[in-house]
Amino acid sequence: MFPVPANLQRLADQIDGWLDLRCPDRALALLAPMLADANGRAAGLVLRVRANVRLGEFAAALPDLAELRTLAPAEGWVDLTEAFCRKRLGDLPSAITCLEGMLARDIKSDIGHFNLGCYLALTGERDRAIDEVTLACGLNPECRDFARDDPDLDSLRNDARFRVLLRQAPADAAGNPGPLDDDEDDDDEPPPTGPRDHHRRN
Protein backbone atom coordinates (compact mmCIF):
# COMPACT_ATOMS: atom_id res chain seq x y z
CA MET A 1 0.00 0.00 0.00
CA PHE A 2 2.71 2.46 1.07
CA PRO A 3 6.40 1.65 0.59
CA VAL A 4 8.67 0.97 3.54
CA PRO A 5 12.29 2.18 3.28
CA ALA A 6 14.82 -0.63 3.36
CA ASN A 7 16.34 0.63 6.61
CA LEU A 8 12.94 0.38 8.33
CA GLN A 9 11.71 -2.88 6.81
CA ARG A 10 12.78 -5.05 9.73
CA LEU A 11 11.07 -2.73 12.20
CA ALA A 12 7.92 -2.64 10.06
CA ASP A 13 7.86 -6.44 9.95
CA GLN A 14 8.23 -6.57 13.73
CA ILE A 15 5.35 -4.13 14.23
CA ASP A 16 3.21 -6.03 11.75
CA GLY A 17 3.97 -9.22 13.65
CA TRP A 18 2.73 -7.74 16.91
CA LEU A 19 -0.47 -6.68 15.17
CA ASP A 20 -0.94 -10.19 13.79
CA LEU A 21 -0.50 -11.48 17.34
CA ARG A 22 -3.20 -9.06 18.52
CA CYS A 23 -0.78 -7.05 20.63
CA PRO A 24 -1.45 -3.51 19.36
CA ASP A 25 0.04 -1.88 22.45
CA ARG A 26 3.39 -3.50 21.66
CA ALA A 27 3.11 -2.29 18.07
CA LEU A 28 2.40 1.30 19.13
CA ALA A 29 5.46 1.34 21.36
CA LEU A 30 7.73 0.66 18.37
CA LEU A 31 6.33 3.12 15.85
CA ALA A 32 8.26 6.31 16.65
CA PRO A 33 11.20 5.73 14.23
CA MET A 34 8.85 5.09 11.30
CA LEU A 35 6.70 8.12 12.04
CA ALA A 36 9.76 10.35 12.31
CA ASP A 37 11.16 9.23 8.94
CA ALA A 38 9.86 11.23 5.97
CA ASN A 39 9.97 8.18 3.71
CA GLY A 40 8.53 5.79 6.25
CA ARG A 41 5.85 7.96 7.80
CA ALA A 42 2.98 6.87 5.54
CA ALA A 43 3.59 3.19 6.24
CA GLY A 44 3.94 4.05 9.92
CA LEU A 45 0.59 5.83 9.88
CA VAL A 46 -1.06 2.75 8.37
CA LEU A 47 0.38 0.61 11.15
CA ARG A 48 -0.73 3.09 13.81
CA VAL A 49 -4.24 3.13 12.36
CA ARG A 50 -4.32 -0.66 12.46
CA ALA A 51 -3.16 -0.64 16.08
CA ASN A 52 -5.72 1.93 17.17
CA VAL A 53 -8.51 0.09 15.37
CA ARG A 54 -7.47 -3.10 17.11
CA LEU A 55 -7.59 -1.26 20.44
CA GLY A 56 -11.01 0.19 19.66
CA GLU A 57 -9.57 3.72 19.63
CA PHE A 58 -11.51 4.71 16.53
CA ALA A 59 -11.40 8.46 17.12
CA ALA A 60 -7.62 8.31 17.49
CA ALA A 61 -7.35 6.68 14.05
CA LEU A 62 -9.18 9.48 12.22
CA PRO A 63 -6.37 12.11 12.16
CA ASP A 64 -3.94 9.54 10.74
CA LEU A 65 -6.48 8.54 8.11
CA ALA A 66 -6.93 12.20 7.18
CA GLU A 67 -3.17 12.56 6.71
CA LEU A 68 -3.03 9.40 4.63
CA ARG A 69 -5.82 10.74 2.45
CA THR A 70 -3.66 13.75 1.54
CA LEU A 71 -0.86 11.37 0.51
CA ALA A 72 -3.02 8.94 -1.48
CA PRO A 73 -6.48 10.36 -2.23
CA ALA A 74 -7.51 7.31 -4.26
CA GLU A 75 -6.46 4.65 -1.74
CA GLY A 76 -9.59 2.61 -1.01
CA TRP A 77 -8.19 1.20 2.23
CA VAL A 78 -8.36 4.68 3.74
CA ASP A 79 -12.04 5.06 2.83
CA LEU A 80 -12.99 1.60 4.04
CA THR A 81 -11.18 2.03 7.33
CA GLU A 82 -12.48 5.54 7.96
CA ALA A 83 -16.01 4.34 7.22
CA PHE A 84 -15.60 1.53 9.73
CA CYS A 85 -14.26 3.90 12.39
CA ARG A 86 -17.07 6.38 11.87
CA LYS A 87 -19.65 3.61 12.00
CA ARG A 88 -18.21 2.42 15.29
CA LEU A 89 -18.35 6.00 16.58
CA GLY A 90 -22.04 6.16 15.72
CA ASP A 91 -21.69 8.43 12.70
CA LEU A 92 -23.35 6.35 10.00
CA PRO A 93 -23.99 9.27 7.61
CA SER A 94 -20.26 10.02 7.44
CA ALA A 95 -19.46 6.32 7.09
CA ILE A 96 -21.84 6.09 4.14
CA THR A 97 -20.32 9.21 2.56
CA CYS A 98 -16.85 7.65 2.77
CA LEU A 99 -17.97 4.53 0.94
CA GLU A 100 -19.94 6.44 -1.66
CA GLY A 101 -16.82 8.46 -2.45
CA MET A 102 -14.72 5.33 -2.78
CA LEU A 103 -17.26 3.64 -5.06
CA ALA A 104 -17.42 6.72 -7.25
CA ARG A 105 -13.76 5.99 -8.04
CA ASP A 106 -13.88 2.19 -7.97
CA ILE A 107 -17.33 0.87 -8.83
CA LYS A 108 -16.06 -2.74 -8.86
CA SER A 109 -15.09 -2.92 -5.19
CA ASP A 110 -17.15 -5.78 -3.80
CA ILE A 111 -16.25 -4.99 -0.19
CA GLY A 112 -17.20 -1.36 -0.78
CA HIS A 113 -20.66 -2.28 -2.07
CA PHE A 114 -21.15 -4.87 0.67
CA ASN A 115 -20.19 -2.57 3.53
CA LEU A 116 -22.26 0.25 2.06
CA GLY A 117 -25.23 -2.12 1.93
CA CYS A 118 -24.70 -2.99 5.58
CA TYR A 119 -24.54 0.63 6.66
CA LEU A 120 -27.59 1.57 4.59
CA ALA A 121 -29.52 -1.30 6.17
CA LEU A 122 -28.68 0.06 9.60
CA THR A 123 -30.15 3.44 8.63
CA GLY A 124 -33.35 1.87 7.31
CA GLU A 125 -32.64 2.44 3.59
CA ARG A 126 -33.67 -1.08 2.71
CA ASP A 127 -34.03 -0.78 -1.07
CA ARG A 128 -30.63 0.86 -1.52
CA ALA A 129 -29.09 -1.64 0.89
CA ILE A 130 -30.38 -4.59 -1.14
CA ASP A 131 -29.16 -2.98 -4.35
CA GLU A 132 -25.65 -2.59 -2.91
CA VAL A 133 -25.48 -6.12 -1.52
CA THR A 134 -26.73 -7.43 -4.87
CA LEU A 135 -23.90 -5.61 -6.64
CA ALA A 136 -21.40 -7.02 -4.14
CA CYS A 137 -22.65 -10.57 -4.75
CA GLY A 138 -22.39 -10.09 -8.49
CA LEU A 139 -18.78 -8.99 -8.16
CA ASN A 140 -17.86 -11.65 -5.62
CA PRO A 141 -20.19 -14.60 -4.96
CA GLU A 142 -18.61 -15.09 -1.52
CA CYS A 143 -20.48 -11.98 -0.40
CA ARG A 144 -23.66 -14.04 -0.48
CA ASP A 145 -22.25 -16.18 2.33
CA PHE A 146 -21.35 -13.08 4.35
CA ALA A 147 -24.85 -11.69 3.79
CA ARG A 148 -26.43 -14.81 5.28
CA ASP A 149 -24.73 -14.26 8.63
CA ASP A 150 -24.14 -10.52 8.92
CA PRO A 151 -26.20 -8.99 11.74
CA ASP A 152 -26.08 -5.56 10.08
CA LEU A 153 -28.41 -6.98 7.43
CA ASP A 154 -31.00 -8.40 9.85
CA SER A 155 -33.53 -5.71 8.91
CA LEU A 156 -33.57 -7.11 5.35
CA ARG A 157 -34.25 -10.74 6.15
CA ASN A 158 -38.02 -10.55 5.69
CA ASP A 159 -37.69 -8.77 2.35
CA ALA A 160 -38.54 -11.01 -0.62
CA ARG A 161 -35.78 -9.50 -2.79
CA PHE A 162 -33.17 -10.24 -0.15
CA ARG A 163 -34.37 -13.81 0.36
CA VAL A 164 -34.19 -14.41 -3.40
CA LEU A 165 -30.68 -12.95 -3.49
CA LEU A 166 -29.48 -15.34 -0.78
CA ARG A 167 -30.92 -18.33 -2.65
CA GLN A 168 -29.37 -17.46 -5.99
CA ALA A 169 -26.41 -19.45 -7.30
CA PRO A 170 -23.35 -17.43 -8.32
CA ALA A 171 -23.86 -18.43 -11.97
CA ASP A 172 -26.87 -19.57 -13.94
CA ALA A 173 -27.33 -23.01 -15.43
CA ALA A 174 -25.56 -21.98 -18.62
CA GLY A 175 -22.49 -21.00 -16.68
CA ASN A 176 -22.90 -17.28 -17.25
CA PRO A 177 -21.23 -15.04 -14.70
CA GLY A 178 -23.31 -13.04 -12.26
CA PRO A 179 -24.02 -9.33 -12.73
CA LEU A 180 -21.01 -7.06 -13.23
CA ASP A 181 -18.58 -9.99 -13.05
CA ASP A 182 -16.90 -9.20 -16.34
CA ASP A 183 -13.43 -10.50 -15.62
CA GLU A 184 -11.93 -13.62 -14.16
CA ASP A 185 -9.63 -11.99 -11.63
CA ASP A 186 -10.71 -10.86 -8.19
CA ASP A 187 -8.42 -7.91 -7.62
CA ASP A 188 -10.35 -6.39 -4.72
CA GLU A 189 -8.36 -7.29 -1.66
CA PRO A 190 -9.81 -6.75 1.82
CA PRO A 191 -8.17 -4.11 3.97
CA PRO A 192 -5.51 -5.36 6.40
CA THR A 193 -6.97 -3.70 9.50
CA GLY A 194 -9.27 -6.47 10.56
CA PRO A 195 -12.66 -4.76 10.33
CA ARG A 196 -15.15 -6.08 7.90
CA ASP A 197 -17.18 -5.13 10.06
CA HIS A 198 -15.12 -4.12 9.06
CA HIS A 199 -14.27 -6.62 7.19
CA ARG A 200 -16.32 -9.57 7.04
CA ARG A 201 -13.91 -11.47 4.87
CA ASN A 202 -10.66 -10.57 6.54
Where are the model-predicted features located?
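TPR/TPR-like (Sel1-like) alpha-helical repeat modules
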Residues: 121, 126-145, 167-173
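"A position-specific structural signal for the A-helix of alpha-solenoid helical repeats
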Residues: 13, 47, 81, 115, ...
